[in-house]
UniProtKB/Swiss-Prot annotation:
Residues 1-46 are annotated as: Disordered. It comes from the Eukaryota. It comes from Dictyostelium discoideum. Residues 25-40 have a biased composition (Polar residues). This is Putative uncharacterized protein DDB_G0285187.
Length: 46
């Protein structure tokens, strides 16, 4: 799963987020700060 998100990192910043998932969360969540931490933790964890 982490590998699948790694390649997105290149396309992530282009949309405005390091992770594709983060972009989706930002759209649904009014505060991208919260999902940002969750996304980072999820990706950091094995």
């Amino acid at each position: 799963m982490n590998f699948g998100i790694k390649p997105d990192v290149s396309s992530g910043p282009r949309k405005g987020g390091p992770f594709k998932e983060l972009s989706d969360f930002s759209k649904t969540s009014p505060t991208p700060q919260q999902p940002r931490s969750l996304s980072g933790k999820s990706v950091m964890l094995p």
